[in-house]
Design a protein with these regions (language model features):
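Membrane-proximal helix-turn-helix segments that form the acceptor-binding/catalytic region
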Residues: 92-111
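Glycosyltransferase donor-sugar binding loop
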Residues: 139, 194-212, 228
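Short hydrophobic beta-strand element within catalytic cores of glycosyltransferases
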Residues: 267-270
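Nucleotide-activated donor-binding/catalytic signature segment of Leloir-type glycosyltransferases, i.e.
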Residues: 210-230
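Aromatic "clamp/platform" in nucleotide-sugar-dependent glycosyltransferases that forms part
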Residues: 250
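Carbohydrate-associated surface elements
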Residues: 117, 138
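Conserved donor-binding/catalytic core segment of Leloir-type glycosyltransferases
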Residues: 162-178, 184-190, 196-198
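Short alpha-helical donor nucleotide-sugar binding micro-motif in glycosyltransferases
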Residues: 229, 237-242
Length: 273
């Protein structure tokens, strides 16, 4: 039986602490493990493939799509508008970047969105609705799962968190769009509750609100712990040591953290978007 060759193009795993990388790794593992009878998956390969599947929008991937004689698929992990509140660039540079994103998406034969609510936003940017398909994000239950109490207490001890504390967890890059300042304000109003934020400045000084958020990060309230960027293989420990996931984000597509927390059997407190 002839296998369909899929060339997965991505550099998402090169930037630590961002959900795009997690989504990419989960999807590659899913196709390799569950659909290996039908698909031959290669990563960033230079040879021709039946399907090119872009997970990030590097210019070299755009060139590959334009030269490709097979089918081009691009994952929509963010919209042009979600750059606002995520990174800060000069207005002219941001305008050009948004146009580039739209051009990249238009070049693909098919676009995959992880949340159907954003189909209309892509159409607003001039993209043909018929080429947009919805496939939700996926998180393996072998990677994220409920742990035993003894293991949870070990993790709390590692991060100097009292074993009897009620722990509210925030996950994501430290940036304006993620609602970090609201997270802090809630923590100030609940001084007897422990708040933990897992994530950091994945894009350094171009992070939106960097100077203000850096000051908060380095001098948080007494009941807030910023634990930095945690390797993905350790994130299951972090979810398990928490009592609830709190995500005050202002703009999201489909955060991997929600699925990861659900697999770890944690309740969710989310902003109504």
């Amino acid at each position: 039986m002839h296998k369909i060759k899929i060339n997965m193009l991505s550099n998402a795993d090169k930037v630590r602490g961002q959900g795009v990388g997690s989504a990419y790794l989960e999807q590659v593992a899913l196709v390799k493990n569950e659909l290996s009878d039908y698909f031959d998956v290669v990563i960033n390969d230079s040879k021709p493939a039946d399907i090119i599947h872009c997970h990030t929008i590097l210019p070299q991937y755009l060139m590959k799509m334009k030269r490709n004689k097979g089918i081009n698929v691009a994952y929509v992990h963010f919209l042009p508008d979600t750059l606002d509140g995520s990174i800060q660039l000069p207005h002219s540079a941001l305008t050009v970047f948004k146009k580039y994103i739209t051009h990249f998406y238009n070049t693909a034969d098919y676009l995959i969105v992880v949340n159907p609510i954003f189909i209309k936003d892509l159409v607003r940017f001039g993209i043909d609705e018929h080429k947009i398909k919805y496939i939700p994000n996926f998180v393996s239950k072998e990677t994220f799962y409920k742990q035993e109490k003894e293991h949870i207490q070990q993790t709390r001890s590692q991060y100097h968190i009292d074993e009897n504390a009620f722990v509210v967890l925030g996950v994501g890059q430290v940036q304006t769009r993620k609602g970090v300042k609201d997270f802090i304000e809630v923590a100030k109003k609940l001084p007897d509750i422990t708040f933990v934020w897992a994530g950091g400045f994945s894009f350094g000084k171009i992070t939106d609100g960097y100077e203000e958020l850096k000051e908060i990060y380095e001098n948080p309230p007494h009941n807030v712990h910023f634990i930095g960027i945690v390797p993905r293989e350790s994130m299951n420990d972090i979810y398990n040591m928490a009592d609830i996931l709190f995500m005050p984000s202002y703009n999201e597509l489909f955060p991997m953290s929600i699925l990861e927390a659900i697999n770890s059997q944690k309740p969710l407190l989310l902003r109504n978007l």
